[in-house]
C-alpha cells in the first residue's frame, strides 16, 4: 500500500484522532452485530500499546443533523468497547465545542475517548457549508488515522476534510490496510480464474458503474435480486409486479451487449419465488421465468432451479465476489436463496470468496458461515466503489507512505 501506516508514526504520549465505522445495527438499545467494532480493535489496541491517547470518531445511522437524537447516540457502543478494552471509556456528549475540548484535554495516554455521533452536526455530511467543523475535530490531535473503510467512499468532513489538516500525519489503520490489500490483490490485480461476481440488491442504477467495471475483469456475472428483474425485462421476460427500474432497461440492454462482446457470461434467474406481497412470507409459489410471472404477482427470491444454477457457477469458479442479497432475506422463506449462496460460498474452500459488506454480510452472519468466507468486507458501498475506481476519497487523501 502506498499510504502512510500507523506503524510509521511515533505515537508515545501523542493524541490520535481515529475515524472508525461504528455504524452498527441497534435495536432497543442493544447492538445486534458488533463486527465493525471488533474489526477496529487491532488498531485501537496497537495505539494504546504505543502509549497514545485515542480519540474515536464515528457516525451512526442517518440523523437529521443539527440536533441531538437519542436514537442515534453512540451510547450503546460504550459497554461493548469497554468489554473489549477492559477499562472505562468516557463518551463525550458532543464531538465539538467546549465539552468535547475538555474531554480531550483530560484524556491521558493509554486511554480511549469516544466522541458523540459526528452526524449530529451538518458540517459532517456537508463540509462546504461549515468548514469550521473539520477544523475543530482536527485541533484535538497530533495524528489522524482512518480505519473506517465502510465510510471512505463518502467525502464527509471526518473522512475527507479532516485528514487534509494533517499533512504527513494522516495514516491508514490496520482494518483499512487489510481491506485495501485484500480487495486490491485478490479482485483487481491478480484474481484467480474463473472470476465470478454476484450482484444483487434492489437497484441496478446504483450499481451500473461497478457492473461496467466488472465486465472488464470477470468471467461470469450473476445478476439477481431486484436488479435481476430489470435485466429480465431487458430480454423481454414477463416479470409481473416485480421490482423493475423502467429507466434502467436501456442500460441493462447495453450491459448485456457489452458482456457478449467481451465474452463475459451473464447468469440471470430462471425461476422465482413469487407472491402477491412479501411482508408475511405466506401464499408463495415458484414459477419459471420462461413461462413468466403474471400481473398481480412479484418475485421476492430466486427459486430452486436458480439456486442450483448459481451454485454450479460458484463451484466452478476460483474467485467469487458477492454484493447484495438475491431475495428479500429479512422475510422467510424469501431468505432461502441468499442463504444458499452464502452456504455455497462457505463450502467452496479452495476458492477465494469475498463478501462485499452490507446486506450480503448480514446474510452470511445469519447463515452462520462468516468464518468460512475468505474475506467479509466491512464496507458495502465502499467495496463496490473501490472495485469500480480502484480507490476511495477517504484513502486517496491520506499521506503518502514514507520512502
Swiss-Prot record:
It comes from the Bacteria. It is found in: Cytoplasm. ATP binds at residues 207, 299, 330, 357-360. Substrate binds at residues 21-23, 36, 59-62, 119, 154. GO terms for cellular component: cytosol. Pathway: Carbohydrate degradation; glycolysis; pyruvate from D-glyceraldehyde 3-phosphate: step 2/5. It catalyses: (2R)-3-phosphoglycerate + ATP = (2R)-3-phospho-glyceroyl phosphate + ADP. GO terms for biological process: gluconeogenesis; glycolytic process. Gene3D superfamilies: Phosphoglycerate kinase, N-terminal domain. Its EC number is 2.7.2.3. Keywords: ATP-binding, Cytoplasm, Glycolysis, Kinase, Nucleotide-binding, Transferase. Signal peptide: none annotated. GO terms for molecular function: ADP binding; ATP binding; phosphoglycerate kinase activity. It is an enzyme of class 2 (transferase). InterPro entries: Phosphoglycerate_kinase, Phosphoglycerate_kinase_CS, Phosphoglycerate_kinase_N, Phosphoglycerate_kinase_sf. Monomer. Belongs to the phosphoglycerate kinase family. HAMAP family: Phosphoglyc_kinase. This is Phosphoglycerate kinase.
